[in-house]
Curated annotation (Swiss-Prot):
Pathway: Amine and polyamine degradation; betaine degradation; sarcosine from betaine: step 1/2; Amino-acid biosynthesis; L-methionine biosynthesis via de novo pathway; L-methionine from L-homocysteine (BhmT route): step 1/1. This is Betaine--homocysteine S-methyltransferase 1. Highly expressed in liver and kidney (at protein level). Expressed at lower levels in testis, lung, cerebellum, skeletal muscle and pancreas (at protein level). InterPro entries: Betaine-hCys_S-MeTrfase_BHMT, BHMT, HCY_dom, HCY_dom_sf. Residues 11-314 form the Hcy-binding domain. It comes from Rattus norvegicus (Rat). Keywords: Cytoplasm, Metal-binding, Methyltransferase, Nucleus, Phosphoprotein, Transferase, Zinc. The lineage of its organism: Eukaryota, Metazoa, Chordata, Craniata, Vertebrata. SUPFAM superfamilies: Homocysteine S-methyltransferase (SSF82282). It catalyses: L-homocysteine + glycine betaine = N,N-dimethylglycine + L-methionine. Involved in the regulation of homocysteine metabolism. Converts betaine and homocysteine to dimethylglycine and methionine, respectively. This reaction is also required for the irreversible oxidation of choline.
Length: 407
């Protein structure tokens, strides 16, 4: 598509990465918008793009102002089968096409307010969990891809996949577009839920057509970077090249198992004590950069101030600060304007780097025991349905939870 008159054409994602630039992604839309009252926890579907476009637009703008130069379409779980899963019935009121189109329009509008690109995103499907065929699952990805092509997104992202098999199917479907593809999996160092190692996952994704690979969601920054290191080693051993991408959680989850934070008993409504500080995220950004990751952002829990922390930490490499830094002194330097002297004494990097942060919850444990049900594709509990979950189905799950807790 020709550039708008008077505006310089934007460089694409691979042009930026080829030039050695750091690309900063956005943060966690479904969690942020759930807290604001626009997304329903449980289905986590993005119909807010149609129902409350101003809320989605504002969050995009806040991420742009914080330093993001990719506006990812709010199309997480926007496949037709997810929009009508377990009694959600969104697709009966608002078609998947309308949700995807609205999300693309909003992302493009905000991206064009700055030097940001638009990425059209697909994610794992209920159909795959229910053992549908490769052809059926790819058809779902192609439905979203048709919208992304019509709206001329700049590149594509296949994100949030627990099984590399489905991620490969997504990449293969998206590859027909001819646009650059990034692929991220929600896995930890143990690999995907079928036991495929991170290194092998990366190799399969690159061979399928992904130019950028990495992880998103499910694990904290530290664990996510451990996984990316294994992916990097796998690619090097196979003599394959790809750019690395990390969209970690903004929660500390050292106690989670193979399923990540969704296995923690606090998920999703009790995670606030685990939120990473802006200083934690600066450390994450530096460690990611040192590992060779050049596409850095966040997923669930990541708010605009977390993205600003990435942009500030990597400002020396990028050569500029984001607009949101105008109201943020580096390492708390703005506290020198505070009325209280003991707060002014905190206006220094050493204070915040060395502070051991208390939770304020003296009777609570610092770690939790993951549920670890161990179910994956093919398990009866993971077979999806259009109808709402029945009371009988819920009672069976409650009983299983009691049994697991007693073990």
């Amino acid at each position: 598509m020709a550039p708008i008159a008077g505006k310089k054409a934007k460089r694409g994602i691979l042009e930026r990465l080829n030039a050695g630039e750091v690309v900063i992604g956005d943060g966690g839309f479904v969690f942020a918008l759930e807290k604001r009252g626009y997304v329903k926890a449980g289905p986590w579907t993005p119909e807010a793009a149609v129902e409350h476009p101003e809320a989605v637009r504002q969050l995009h703008r806040e991420f742009l102002r914080a330093g993001s130069n990719v506006m990812q379409t709010f199309t997480f779980y926007a496949s037709e089968d997810k929009l009508e899963n377990r009694g959600n019935y969104v697709a009966e009121k608002i078609s998947g096409q309308k949700v995807n189109e609205a999300a693309c329009d909003i992302a493009r509008q905000v991206a064009d307010e700055g030097d940001a690109l638009v990425a059209g995103g697909v994610s794992q499907t209920p159909s795959y969990l229910s053992c549908k065929s490769e052809t059926e699952v790819k058809k779902i990805f192609h439905q979203q891809l048709e919208v992304f092509m019509k709206k001329n997104v700049d590149f594509l992202i296949a994100e949030y996949f627990e099984h590399v098999e489905e991620a490969v199917w997504a990449v293969e479907a998206l590859k027909t577009s001819g646009k650059p593809i990034a692929a991220t999996m929600c896995i930890g160092p143990e690999g995907d839920l079928h036991g495929v190692s991170p290194g092998e996952c990366a190799v399969r994704l690159v061979k399928a057509g992904a130019a950028i690979v990495g992880v998103n969601c499910h694990f904290d920054p530290s664990t996510s970077l451990q996984t990316i290191k294994l992916m990097k080693e796998g690619l090097e051993a196979a003599r394959l090249k790809a750019y690395l991408m990390s969209h970690a959680l903004a929660y500390h989850t050292p106690d989670c198992g193979k399923q990540g934070f969704i296995d923690l008993p606090e998920f999703p409504f009790g995670l606030e004590p685990r939120v990473a500080t802006r200083w934690d995220i600066q450390k994450y950004a530096r460690e990611a950069y040192n590992l060779g990751v050049r596409y850095i952002g966040g997923c669930c829990g990541f708010e605009p101030y977390h993205i600003r922390a990435i942009a500030e930490e990597l400002a020396p490499e990028r050569g500029f600060l984001p607009p949101a830094s105008e109201k943020h002194g580096s390492w708390g330097s703005g506290l020198d304007m505070h009325t209280k002297p003991w707060i002014r004494a905190r206006a220094r990097k050493e204070y915040w780097q060395n502070l051991r942060i208390a939770s304020g919850r003296p009777y609570n444990p610092s770690m939790s025991k993951p549920d670890a049900w161990g179910v994956t594709k093919g398990a009866a509990e993971l077979m999806q349905q259009k109808e709402a979950t029945t009371e009988q189905q819920l009672r069976a799950l409650f009983e299983k939870q009691k049994f697991k807790s007693a073990q």
